[in-house]
Structure formats: structure tokens, C-alpha cells
Amino acid sequence: MHSILPRFVTDPFLDRCYAALEVIAAQGTAIGAALAALTAVAGDSLAVKNTGDAAPAKLLQLWTDVQVAGTVRLRSPKFHDNVQGMRFDTIIGDIRPLLPWGISQAIYPNDVLVAELAGSAVAGDVETLAMLNYYPNLPGAAARFITPDEVMRRAVNIFTVENTLALGTAGGWSGGEAINVEFDQFHAGAQYALVGYVVDVECAAVAWRGADTANLRVGGPGEETERELTANWFMRLSKAFNLALVPVFSAENKGGITVEGVQDENGADVTVNSIFVELSR
């Protein structure tokens, strides 16, 4: 039987794999009380990446950021049904994940997911759906992930980095800045596991991107009130799905690690505290 876990090869410091993790967002403006199709934000796509003959990708989580309570629906001909698919009521300002932990939905190469929301009809109001996709073997990807057990075995120091993101008012990803712009205390030559994060202001999503993530965004919800949810976000994901999902960054790449977020039209700035664990070699 072929394993669906990521493939690994030998690396002097940690295992490298062909797996990839990506958070994507879709938005609509003044969508109204009836379900309306959302559009992927610039740089993202609702089409599942082509993994060739590899094991199917997985939708691990989804969440919303809405200004009027309504409904979210995500569907595909390859889901249980293409009529309602996954459908949830939404709550104003509730950015918490909607899917059960540890149970993923298979998604298939080139399938275009249909994302819909019903919510605010107020002119200019931006409503957002975000989702987190996992690819067990994505051709060309060179992202680096380890398991929670590996993090705990190699943990040396807890290390936090602060970035204040000037998020825009037009929706989509914005406010991107290098992770070392405001605080640069990284140890030369060190490897750091990103175990989680906290934010001080609500936003639809926050993400990190760089060479160590195969230049795909890895991230989660911008939930400011339930910090215990996000402080160990990647550890929680890994444990729930029994996968290596804790991103690892090299200090040498710090200038190329971008932190960014998705915000609505109100454009509130968000301070992100990235929570790293320095790893032994």
C-alpha cells in the first residue's frame, strides 16, 4: 500500500519533502442575502493545482470573515454532491475554522471549486472565504515541513517576531513585509519551525511565504480573540491530520520570508506575532 504521507529525502538539517500547503482566499463585495459566487483574490485560484498521478490533494480547513451573518457554500462535482456540497451558516466577525479537525475533503487536479457567500448588501462591504489546501506530492515544490514530534525533539528556544501589516482597503492579500524588517534577532545559520502565531486585530487570513514554503502562502485565520487556536496553529494541524505540516524556515532566507494578510474594506492594520521554535541541528 502506498503511503499518503509526504515523501522525504535526506537533508543535513531536516527532511525535505515534496508536500505543499497553501492558504487561498476568495472574496465578494456587497454580495447580498442570496448566495453569490466569489472570485479568488489576485494571485490565488479556486482551481486545484495539478498533482499528476500523485495522491489527491486535501482541503484541510475553511473559514469566513463576514460583516453580516449569512451562508457560505463550497461545492464541486467531486464532492458528496454538487448541489449544497459543504454549507454553513456564518457569524459576524467569527474567523474560526468550520471543518472538523482531522477529517479532510479530497480535492482533485484542475477541479475548479465553486465558492459562494450570502451576507452584507451594504455598498463596499467585502466578504471573504479562506481555505487551506494540502498537496502530498506537488511537482516542483520544495517546501520544508516537519512533525510536532520532530519539533519537540529538536526544540532549543521559543522565538517570536513581530510584524505590523499595513493592510489595504481593496481586499486581497496586502501589507506584505519581510519578516525581519521590524525585529531581526535570527541566529545565523539556524533553522526555525513556525508553530503558530497571534494577531491583535481581526482579519480574514495571515500567511507566510518564501523559498522554504515553495513560494506558496502557508497560514491561517486572523482570529484575534481565541489566541489558543492560532498560537499552535501548525502544530494543531499536524497532530489533527497526522501529517508533517509545521513549516521550517532557514535564518539565511529571512529577507525573503514575507508576512501578509487579507483584510476587508475597512483596512485595519494587524500586528502579527510569529511564534517560532529554534531547532537543534
Regions found by a protein language model. Give the residues of each.
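Beta-strand-centric surfaces of beta-sandwich/beta-rich domains
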Residues: 1-281
